[in-house]
């Protein structure tokens, strides 16, 4: 694992009244990762936290370098055809000291949404078992247990969690928040029943407060990914759009309010990348997906307050060496 120091530079050339902006610039912040799958930026510090999923750990990237924060997560696998080792998945902060981690290394029904008190910068890493709290969505005779808590979106009142347990339901779960703590974790929106495409994965909160869900769809079916908008209180579907993308893995809004998605493109990963989604809500014109960058198996993305976009990619391994990276993209228009 190597840290590469990154200083975002946007070159603006001015000649009389003409301003030319540089194209988006991509730099590697961290490499040597094993199937990274989640990113969160710590409030107040701006430190970047990454779930190095296949290595079973959470890493902090700060001005001193890259450091383990939580280690020893259980490991499982995901996928058809090529399978990828996974452990911790989605990340979000409740506050500066409280990190929520979606698990992916245990069987459905045993998997946990985990809450941690994060060690201070420079302190020793803690073990995955040292949780402040944990929650499961177990099964019974009539209900399948849930797991692979991939995407986490926090609106301050609840954390919405995409899960991939019961493929006939496609649940987005809801972790209610009160006083900086998770008080309840329950199934909330059966997305497969509503939009008839399975595998909710990327999630985000829109400017109007609605929940945006990216349906990954079948990895053996081309360009079936959807984005859907739901009321966070009632769970009612507000809008649903085809995107023309293969497999949406992440969604994020920029500080300017633009919606971006990562497409893994499982069937043909050469078509994967970062896309800007221009959505005409309340109309039949749908979504215009504009490709911004080609990326090698992207899995997650998030913006800093300054507009820098952090993206994780699995990459293509050579001779068994981990090929995952944390990238930073600057200069997005």
What are these regions (language model features)?
Residues 30-45, 75-102, 135-158, 192-216, ...:
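Beta-rich, blade/repeat-based domains predominating
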Residues 38-68, 81-130, 149-162:
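Acidic, Gly/Ser/Thr-rich repeat motifs that build Ca2+-stabilized beta-propeller blades
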Residues 53-54, 104-106, 164-167, 215-218, ...:
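Short loop/turn segments immediately following the C-termini of beta-strands
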Residues 61-65, 117-122, 176-181, 230-236, ...:
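Short loop/turn segments that connect beta-strands within beta-propeller blades
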Residues 1-9:
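Bacterial N-terminal signal peptides that target proteins for export
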Residues 109-114, 168-174, 221-228, 269-275, ...:
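Structural motif
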Residues 27-30, 64-74, 123-138, 182-192, ...:
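Beta-propeller fold detector
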């Amino acid at each position: 694992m190597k840290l590469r120091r990154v200083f975002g530079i946007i070159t603006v050339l001015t000649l009389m009244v003409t301003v030319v902006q540089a194209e988006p610039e991509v730099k590697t912040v961290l490499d040597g990762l094993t199937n990274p799958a989640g990113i969160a930026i710590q409030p107040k510090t701006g430190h970047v936290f990454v779930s190095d999923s296949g290595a079973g750990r959470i890493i902090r990237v700060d001005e001193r370098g890259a450091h383990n924060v939580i280690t020893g997560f259980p490991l499982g696998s995901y996928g058809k055809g090529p399978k990828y080792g996974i452990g911790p998945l989605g990340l979000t902060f409740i506050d500066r000291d409280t990190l929520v981690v979606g698990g992916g290394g245990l069987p459905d029904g045993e998997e946990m949404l985990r809450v941690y008190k994060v060690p201070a910068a420079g302190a020793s890493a803690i073990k995955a078992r040292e949780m402040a709290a944990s929650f499961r969505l177990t099964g019974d005779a009539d209900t399948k247990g849930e797991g692979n808590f991939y995407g986490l979106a926090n609106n301050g009142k609840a954390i919405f969690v995409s899960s991939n347990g019961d493929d006939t339901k496609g649940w987005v779960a809801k972790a209610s928040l009160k006083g900086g703590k998770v008080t309840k974790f329950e199934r909330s929106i059966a997305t497969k029943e509503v939009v008839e495409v399975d595998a909710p994965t990327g999630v985000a909160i829109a400017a109007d407060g609605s929940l945006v869900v990216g349906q990954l769809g079948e990895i053996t079916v081309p360009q079936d990914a959807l984005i859907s908008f739901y009321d966070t209180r009632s769970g009612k579907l507000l809008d649903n759009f085809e995107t023309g993308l293969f497999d949406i893995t992440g969604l994020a809004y920029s500080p300017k309010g633009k919606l971006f998605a990562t497409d893994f493109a499982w069937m043909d990963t050469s078509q994967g990348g970062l896309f800007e989604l221009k959505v005409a809500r309340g109309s039949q014109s749908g979504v215009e997906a504009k490709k911004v960058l080609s990326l090698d198996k992207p899995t997650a993305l998030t913006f800093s307050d300054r507009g820098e976009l952090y993206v994780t990619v699995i990459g293509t391994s050579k001779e068994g060496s981990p090929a995952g990276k944390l990238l930073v993209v600057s200069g997005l228009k």
